[in-house]
A protein has these predicted regions:
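Acidic, glycine-rich segments characteristic of secretory precursors and extracytoplasmic regions
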Residues: 1-13
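Short, flexible, mixed-charge acidic loops at enzyme active sites
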Residues: 101-117
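Conserved, well-structured interaction surfaces
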Residues: 21-98, 123-132, 142-157
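Residue register of alpha-helical TPR repeats
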Residues: 82, 89, 162, 167-169
């Protein structure tokens, strides 16, 4: 998981006793965090999640979810919709933690990552504006809405969503 541990703050109090020395809250309590090793970092953890999601979005069409092409399309659309929604959510939390006004009076956000990164990626990029980040989040939400079902339930083979029936699936 990109977050390394479950979200819980109780373990950071004197109410909890942990035996797991690799737990991030134990690392915090024992002073083993550094500026380049912050396990609770929104920057690091959210960008890790976005990297995983971007990689998934790039490779999703190549996965054979089913040998039936129509079923494969249904799976692919739903998974892509979930990925767009998760990327928007992670971008929101990243923007909330690191967006803000700069000395030049501009409201900045964070660098927008639309594609997965590799060793040849230029990592020296400037922050995008807050407005551009919000636009990116809304685009991902719109993509998610287009691809996700209205409700999640157990479906039968005859229970095809109307949008796919209209397409002849």
């Amino acid at each position: 998981s990109p977050y390394n541990s479950p979200v819980t703050n109780e373990v950071a109090t004197d109410n909890a006793v942990l035996n797991d020395v690799s737990n991030n809250w134990v690392k915090l309590a024992t002073g083993s965090w550094t500026s380049d090793n912050d396990e609770a970092s929104q920057w690091q953890n959210r960008y890790h999640a976005i990297q995983y999601i971007n990689t998934f979005l790039e490779r999703c069409d190549d996965v054979i979810w089913s040998t039936d092409e129509n079923v494969r399309r249904l799976f692919n659309d739903r998974f892509k919709g979930e990925a767009y929604g998760l990327r928007a959510l992670n971008m929101y939390y990243l923007l909330r933690a690191h967006g803000g006004w700069a000395d030049d009076g501009v409201l900045y956000g964070v660098p927008i990552k639309r594609d997965s990164e590799n060793p040849n990626t230029d990592f020296n990029v400037k922050r995008d504006t807050f407005k551009d980040c919000m636009k990116f989040i809304f685009e991902d939400c719109e993509n998610a809405i287009k691809l996700l079902p209205i409700d999640y339930k157990e479906h039968s083979e005859t229970d095809v969503p109307q949008v796919y029936k209209d397409m002849g699936i």
